[in-house]
From Swiss-Prot:
Binding site for ATP: L23, V24, N25, G26, K27, F28, G29, K30, V31, K46
Keyword Kinase on entry: yes
Keywords noted in UniProt: ATP-binding, Kinase, Nucleotide-binding, Serine/threonine-protein kinase, Transferase
InterPro entries: Kinase-like_dom_sf, Prot_kinase_dom, Ser/Thr_kinase_AS, Ser_Thr_kinase_AGC
UniProt name for this protein: Serine/threonine-protein kinase 1
Annotated function: In vitro, can phosphorylate histone H1.
PANTHER family: SERINE/THREONINE-PROTEIN KINASE
Record domain Protein kinase: where: 17-265
Disulfide bonds: none
Family to which the UniProt record says this protein belongs: Belongs to the protein kinase superfamily. Ser/Thr protein kinase family.
Amino acid sequence: MDALIGDFADFHKECSARTALHLVNGKFGKVSVWKHGPTQKSFFYKRIEHKHFNAIEPFVHHLMKFNKYFLRLFYSLHSLREHLLVMDYIPDGDLFDLMQTEPRLREPEISLIAYQLIDALQALHKHNVVHNDVKLENVLYRRFEQIYVCDYGLCKIAGSPSTFEGTVDYFSPEKINKHAAAVHFDWWAVGVLLYEISTGKHPFKLDQDESLDVETLHKRQIQLDVTFPADFDNPFLEEFICFLLGYCYDYRAHSYEVIQKNTYWKSIVHWKQR
């Protein structure tokens, strides 16, 4: 441990804060960007108070360290006040940032994001881990190249007790009903995210600026059909999103095995393999 601390101290001395970059801090952590002088490489520094720190976060970093869709972790250290994670920096921001400038994406970009995000989550699910907070802000994106799933502090081992943690907008019916954590929590959230990037709206909000509570969201999940703008011209994508967001679990795309059978997914795989 002393050697690790010494190594980090030497590393940090060679870094300078990139103060011109304004990042939005998460609910449980403060994020800054530092540049390492000798290599000119930038890193995320994430500082988390001990009361908010979840050991599963560095665990998932370690678990997925060979997967290109997850952030590499270089240091994980703690002091009396906080825990520090030093990770790869992705310069282009997240999907939420992108949607502020381009409120509606088009093909083939949507297919690229869908393919990589589903591939990333399936790799995580193979380890029996649920991300549990899939949303626009937690998908970093090098435009037209690659996504990176980030923020693993709310990850759950499948089968563990579930609570109302995460972002309400992406809660599945089962999460609202406090079922045990399961991979289908993530697949529902993928459906919401794909709807957002392809329409610029939320599937269950009457107004994009509306703040949903759990009760209102659940009522609309039951009562409302997912509808699309009149000019939406991709029937296969529309059907796929509706398949992910069907209220009835038995008729929904609740697993990777079911997703693989969908026409839109098959077309993406074929496109990627050309």
